Amino acid sequence: MGRVIFVSFGLLVVFLSLSGTAADCPSEWSSYEGHCYKAFKQSKTWADAEKFCTQQHKGSHLASFHSSEEADFVVTLTTPSLKTDLVWIGLKNIWNGCYWKWSDGTKLDYKDWREQFECLVSRTVNNEWLSMDCGTTYSFVCKFQA
C-alpha cells in the first residue's frame, strides 16, 4: 500500500513539473508570460506584416510590449535569429489622435514640419522605438495569447 502511494505521489510530481507555467505555444514559437512569440526574417510592410501575423494563429498580431522585461525578451528572441537591427512592432497611428492648435487658440491649418511616420519599429539592440514609413519593409515579430 505504501509503495502505491509513493508511486502515485511520484507520478503527480512529474505531471505537475511537466505542466509547468509555460504557455502552450506551437513549435518554433517562444513563450513568455502567457503569450507566444515568433520572429520572422522576411521583410514586409507594416500592413503586410500585421496581415501575415493574423494568418499565423487565432488572435495573433504584431508584437505589443507591456513591460521592459517583455521587450527584453523579444530582443533575446530577435537578435540571434534575425540578425537585423529593426523589426516592426504593433504600435501604429500614434500621432493621429493628437489635436494641435496654436497658443492663441486658432486651429492648425498649415504645417511645415518634418513628416512624422505612423508606424513603429523596435531597434533590436536596445529596445528603442523609432517611427518609420509604414511602406518600408522590415522583419517583424508576431504575438498571441496562449
Swiss-Prot record:
The keyword Secreted applies. One of its GO terms (molecular function) is toxin activity. Keywords: Disulfide bond, Hemostasis impairing toxin, Platelet aggregation activating toxin, Secreted, Signal, Toxin. GO terms for cellular component: extracellular region. It comes from the Eukaryota. Disulfide bonds join C25-C36, C53-C142, C119-C134. It is found in: Secreted. Expressed by the venom gland. Residues 1-23 form the signal peptide. Residues 32-143 form the C-type lectin domain. The keyword Cell membrane does not apply. Pfam families: Lectin_C. Belongs to the snaclec family. Agglucetin specifically causes platelet aggregation and surface exposure of integrin alpha-IIb/beta-3 with a GPIb-(GP1BA-) dependent manner in washed platelets. It binds to human platelets in a saturable manner, and its binding is specifically blocked by anti-GP Ib mAb. It regulates endothelial cell survival and promotes angiogenesis by activating integrin alpha-v/beta-3 signaling through FAK/phosphatidylinositol 3-kinase (PI3K)/Akt pathway. Heterotetramer of the subunits alpha-1, alpha-2, beta-1 and beta-2; disulfide-linked. This is Snaclec agglucetin subunit beta-1.
